[in-house]
Amino acid sequence: MMKKYVVEVGGRDLIFEVGRLAQQASGSVLVRYGENAVLATAVISEQKREGIDFLPLTVDYIEKAYAAGRIPGGFFRREMGRPSEKETLTSRLIDRPLRPLFPKGLFNEIQIIATVLSGDLELDPDISALNGAAAALEISPAPFKGPVAAVRVGKVDGRLVVNPTNTELKESTLNLIVAGVPDGLVMVEGGARMATEEEILEALFFAQERLQPILATIRLMGEEVGKTKWPLPEVPDYGDLPERVRELAEARLLAAVTQPEKKARRERVEALLREVLEALGPEAAGREKEVAAIFQDLQRQVVRRYVLKEKRRIDGRGFTDIRPIWGEVGMLSRTHGSAIFTRGETQALAVTTLGTPSDEQRIETLLGETFKSFMLHYNFPPYCVGEARMLRGPSRREIGHGALAERAISPVLPSAEEFPYTIRIVSEVLSSNGSSSMATVCGTSMALMDAGVPVKGAVAGVAMGLIKEGEEVAVLSDILGDEDALGDMDFKVAGTAEGITALQMDIKMTGITREVLAQALAQAREARLHILQEMNKIISQPSPGLKEHAPKIVVIQINPDKIREVIGPGGKIIKQIVAQTGVKIDIEDDGRVHISSPTQKAADEAIRIIRDLTAEAEVGAVYTGKVKKIMDFGAFVEILPNTDGLVHISELAHHRVKSVSDVLKEGDEVTVKVLEIDRQGKIRLSRKALLEPEPKTTPQEPAKKHRVPKKRPS
């Protein structure tokens, strides 16, 4: 029996339908919002997965082409299984607020699939998918500390808006996705146009208020139609093993975890664990994994207690201290721009490549085909954390970190009119000990400046952490990897000196107050300004020109009606220009012509040819052309490529011309002046108008006859 739950969000009905579709799933919900219809299913296996110590949760978001009335491209004309970047990012977006809400010790396979069945071209389905996944889990038997829900927040004309449309987002200064539970936020993802810390804080708590009706609706669904929840996983009974591990390790563990360097810290901790196992002897036989789990939990307690009690961090820094920073630009001579950014033991190499408009990334989405002229690709090779493993394609994490850094940099990029290049940045993480995505932001900013890209300002990023026990709180700036793993929050903030451009927050606990978030944002600003100051010592302004090996791009405007003249039949003319000059030419429908060339000389030659091909005759202008055809009444002269005009026989010379061929022959070069262009585009030319007037010949007067008077007869 189908049951419907409706809640008003942002002036539209958010509808949850239960009991009609996908009844074999552990939980299934059809979510409707605007024209969006998303089927969210959750399935939990009845058997535990053996041999693992993590939650085996998989989340997949799928956009079907039929949802927007489209047929997929490609030879097979069907979705081929490999997720798009948008699908990958949305899958991560759904996963992040859900994963922390599962109980510790749950090792059953859980799969969540959100399928877009109908797509609203003005409302992104990602929010509907996240809410649908949360509702499907709420009514499933899976143990889950929900409900959880999400909204998107924009700011249009100074007013905060819930779930703004795509049209509104174009004008919005904020684009935040906020997920929360009844007593706090658990996830934030988004970008901004130089927002202040107070604006971000206001938007977050505005979102928290707007989440409450959705949370109440999802909770009601669980109460009315939800299946009986499975009992929480049993807490392992380790007997007296935890006490034995504490006796053997606690006193020495603090010295191990407070080693300043990551490698030394890891080696000391691993060595101590081996010593504990040896000391336990037969007690630990067959229970090595249990000992490791107990030891890891003890390590977490020791670190957190040390930070809160000593007001210092495991590498010796204070809460607001930033690790030492150094960097360099221009170390790769053949590239178009490069920079290395190092903060403590985290290091990223960013490389800029400039391309032409034809290098833009073509993307198929529910909205149709779009093109992307700025791409940032983040790579996290195994050696950056001292590991050896097989290399594969980019992981979801790599795609997500690249998207975060791309969002941070985008607001400072020049417009296509100012800088008509396609820009690709690749960030190679060479060493990682916390916040490699924010190191990518810093390195990218420097690499763009090194390449001569006229960015509006430098961008830096920092990751903030939190340790909270009761009323004791420590907000940490520029966190290490261990502080991320053992802490309660990972809050990444990026921006310029003027404001925030991107942020990402994942909270592992609830009940974080406005004051704590305000403190985190304030510390992040101080850290960002410090990092920007250090970056400015390396490079503070974009280079005055492009690198030697960067392509030279010139943009000229032609009459759109003349595009066919440049392309020619079957592309013949444009191919000739490319072969003759060695340039690359891209022509847009509005008549903009992008000419990419290795040298300025070749670009100038291509411009001259295109100008000649697209030039239009002007009344009064003088042209030198070739006689194409001789007629009885005049001569047709080609004054511009594919542009002929008529020189009437009366306009050939000042004197009367009996035959056109007496003055001109086919193939002759002749200079003419445009007298008139009629409504049909016919051109009247004159040769005579450019000739000196012929001198007038005065006819000789005949000699006067003198009459001799006749003699009269006398």
Which residue stretches match the model-derived regions?
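Alpha/propeptide regions of enzymes that mature by internal proteolysis
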Residues: M2-Y5, V9-R12, S26, F54, ...
